[in-house]
Structure formats: C-alpha cells, structure tokens
C-alpha cells in the first residue's frame, strides 16, 4: 500500500504541474521561451541555482533543506518551478522534433511506465 501511495503522490504532483502550467500560460503566454533556447536554459539554471543554494547551506542534504525552507519561497516551491520549466522544455523539444521517433519515444514506454 505504501508503494502505491508513492505513485499516487507523484501522479497528483504531475497533475498539479499541468494545472499550474495551464494557468500560467493564460497569464504569461510563452514568455518562458521568448529569448530562445539560451534564455530557456538560463531560466532552468537559475531555478537549479536556488535549489543548490538551499541544499549547500545544509551540507548538501536536500531532505534537511526541504524541512527548513518551507512556504512560498521554500525549497519545494523551487523544485516545483524547476520541474515545470523542464516539462515545458521537454514539450517544446518533442513538438519541434515531430517525425524523429528517437526523440519522441519515452523511456520505459513499452513497460507502461
């Protein structure tokens, strides 16, 4: 049962990401990629820098940092932002690569993951 709850929690996180991305697109459009691929990369790097900074303050123990940095500007908020920008980046790359089956195929697709 604990095993299933982990997957259900991740499914809920993914669904929450999709809903947040839809809402953000209504307000901001595609502003995340307005400055091209380099700008999109820098946005990802900036989000990771925030995660890295908080973990570094706790001897690189990201779990401990997650317990300390909570709330709207907390570690989980930065992790969620990074994950959402990564989803946007993946979607952009895959939609730009239509016809390239190697790029479009998801890892573990055959197993139903």
For each feature predicted by the language model, list its residue ranges.
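Intrinsically disordered, low-complexity regulatory regions
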Residues: 1-113
